Amino acid sequence: MALVENLQQAVDALRKGCVIAYPTEGVFGLGCDPDNQTAMLRLLAIKQRPVEKGVILIAASYAQLRPYVDETQLTAEQLTQVLASWPAPLTWVMPASGDTPSWVRGQFDTVAVRVSDHPVVQKLCLAFGKPLTSTSANLSGQPACVTQQEVMVQLGNQIAVVVEGKTSGRHGPSEIRDARSLQVLRQG
């Protein structure tokens, strides 16, 4: 495992199917290429997370998320509300497109997506050219890591790269809302 300032090293690791850790608004996230099944299964094994739960996709812009979302199942008002809320630490559960891999959406016909305002996430997703998975960096039953040092202690031997940086200081993970009902699914 390497602690890197150079985002290109993280992008190279993602392209090779590796799992990385990176800072987000509130906690460090674990990420991989959402379209690489081997990488996703590796991430889920590290987290000890069942594939049925699905994972969040995090991106620099909605354009990066659009291929994973079925906009035809949303009203114009619903889509406008979602887009107006970003970038922010707000995750929306939206109808999944037919191209969204089952290992991303889990047992659901929806996909959880977020456009982050964190500068490291923005740069990383732009350099990678697509979204990353975003699940809290921690082992099952352990608290989410909020510093690079915590990531290295808890997960260092299981991930390829820790991207240097700090969280934005937000306490806890992002809020999650349903795009169709607007119901809050997880308080943020």
UniProtKB/Swiss-Prot annotation:
The keyword tRNA processing applies. It holds the Pfam family Sua5_yciO_yrdC. GO terms for biological process: regulation of translational fidelity; tRNA threonylcarbamoyladenosine modification. Its main location: cytoplasm. It catalyses: L-threonine + hydrogencarbonate + ATP = L-threonylcarbamoyladenylate + diphosphate + H2O. GO terms for cellular component: cytoplasm. Keywords: ATP-binding, Cytoplasm, Nucleotide-binding, Nucleotidyltransferase, Transferase, tRNA processing. Its EC number is 2.7.7.87. It is found in: Cytoplasm. Residues 4-188 form the YrdC-like domain. Belongs to the SUA5 family. TsaC subfamily. This is Threonylcarbamoyl-AMP synthase. It comes from Vibrio cholerae serotype O1 (strain ATCC 39315 / El Tor Inaba N16961).
